[in-house]
């Protein structure tokens, strides 16, 4: 089978898996729901609480903007406004496309709007995901005294401490041995039938560049603190919605719901994690004895609160920057034609034009030709 055929099979398989998972979780979420009581619960809720919930949600989003900027090298750190717009674009596409396609979209958007390197931006997204999971598990462990005594909660809290210790070990290993351990672990994966050597190589490269933040104690600590604060603020947003449904729960309930729904984002699913989000919220509320119908009505509203504003804001950003993004797309196409016709042998950079997509194999650092002729190339990675 050709490489293109393998890629298509992997893509179709991923979408199929996400669809199956979404249907399964949606079934779990709505099974046993009394739709008559559901309508009554939605009608009787106090939606004025959505105002403070939306304000704190916006504050948490801004903290994520600051967190993302911190992960960049001080020399290449993008400005706040392009970073904010790119993150909104990413949220928009995560809410309309499956498999967290918004992560790729915001990499492209930040490159177009802020001029950031695609390689470095990809690395920051990788480390963001790592920090998010670690922060949620750590908050789960810290919150154990205030959470209901449920077996799965305590087991997950212990896992959080184990991963925290693993992070310390990983940082020490990276400082002593560099990238060799990562390559040793990931290189054999290239032999698997559903992976490609270049993808594994890219994963090693992105992971290592992402861990630069962890190898700088100050940079890693600041980014992780922003991560913790953003999740805590988001927990307050969720708790304000709890007050709107008069569930009689403490702020700790908002934190537990955020932890459950946040960790559920790891699971491949449909756009906006429909079904998966609701099931996770119901599981969290079930620890407090909240009936499934009431929990489901709450999940619907808090999910809409976390989706609709970002869809609207993302559309606005895309519309305002339409010309910039179109010009960036045109530059990319011109770059492909130049690379395909001439290559970069003159400047000593090995470049291979990649089959169907026409993208260059190495396109991640700036390259400048002699002064008499400037190529329209934004980023080409230096030769190894």
For each feature predicted by the language model, list its residue ranges.
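Helix-boundary and loop/linker segments of multi-pass membrane transporters
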Residues: 8-9, 39-46, 75-80, 113-114, ...
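Membrane-embedded helical hairpins/re-entrant loop segments and their flanking transmembrane helices
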Residues: 65-89, 242-257
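Juxtamembrane helix-entry segments on the extracytoplasmic side of multipass membrane proteins
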Residues: 42-51, 151-163, 215-221
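Transmembrane alpha-helix interface/packing and boundary motifs in multi-pass membrane proteins
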Residues: 56, 90-99, 242-243, 258-278
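Transmembrane helix-loop-helix hairpins in multi-pass inner-membrane proteins
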Residues: 1-40, 90-197, 274-384
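Hydrophobic/aromatic residues in alpha-helical transmembrane segments
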Residues: 25, 64-71, 106, 234-241, ...
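Alpha-helical transmembrane segments of MFS and MFS-like solute carriers/permeases
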Residues: 52-56, 222-229, 260
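Alpha-helical transmembrane segments and their immediate interhelical loop/hinge regions
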Residues: 199-245, 249-251
